[in-house]
Regions:
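His/Asp/Glu-rich metal-coordinating catalytic cores
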Residues: 1-72, 77-150
Length: 150
């Protein structure tokens, strides 16, 4: 019988600026529950002609979407939310965001004619949520955009 463990799987953004997408899992190997923290993009430069946006491949978590509890967005910079409307249609899970971030991602989905009203959960600054085994607090900090959290 396996014991419970916490896993961290960075799909993008670790050790670089841009493309932030981190996965966390908790539980026994045969019953792990997952969350995604941020779904960001990076911006291509002239070295990749014809490419505008780059974001992490979500294939790993798409394969585990039945055990995915939701996406938690830390703040509204593009390197943290820019891929949400590209990634979410394959996941169709709950999205947790502060009010300002929620407004911006709602507009991203409107551009793609996707209504996320039923899936979007607004969390106030310093608010707390529980997703399965995860207790998450939206702790505020100083940053260059409204309502940043960690």
């Amino acid at each position: 019988m396996s014991k419970e463990e916490l896993l961290f799987c960075p799909l993008g953004g670790s050790g670089q600026i841009g493309g932030n997408m981190n996965l966390y899992a908790y539980g026994k190997e045969e019953d792990q529950k997952w969350i995604i923290v941020d779904t960001g993009v990076s911006f291509a430069d002239d070295s990749i002609p014809g490419i505008d946006l780059i974001y992490p491949d979500p294939g790993f978590i798409i394969d585990k979407k039945d055990d995915l509890l939701g996406i938690v967005l830390t703040h509204a910079h593009e390197d943290h939310i820019g891929a949400i409307s590209h990634v979410w249609p394959d996941l169709k899970c709950k999205i947790f965001a502060t009010p300002f971030t929620a407004v911006l991602i709602t507009e991203k989905f409107k551009e793609k004619k996707i209504d996320i009203t039923q899936h979007l959960k607004i969390v106030q600054l310093n608010g707390k949520i529980k997703l399965g085994p995860f207790d998450i607090e939206f702790v505020t900090l100083t940053h260059s955009i409204l309502e940043p959290t960690v």
